[in-house]
């Protein structure tokens, strides 16, 4: 299902909250600047989020198939209304279970985005902006100790052992 695939890719690929995802308007997407305007996110704050090339390509395919004019993800019953949260949550949960994932919802996609971006080296302040957190401490909650990455520091005593 092209709609579900696109919803998943945008949610995970941008780290959006479900309400931010479902309230994207076609005009909010700027393919040239590779951004999406998130209007009135949590706390009624607006921000721009960076969009990857793969997410933009998927959005273009989706647009060519569905031709949305207002809401990017509109209700199938009322095109002038955004899709409801349950219309995304239910098929996401169903497909995740079919893949063997026990707990998958839009927030777990957001959490995975944050964790994976930190693992790949995204600076904490950039992630804070992307996620729309007003307090850096909220973003820091996505930091996990990952033994496979080592501690990321240098050996401060390496030069001493040569003396």
Model-derived regions, located:
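Conserved catalytic core of the tyrosine transesterase superfamily
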Residues: 1-163
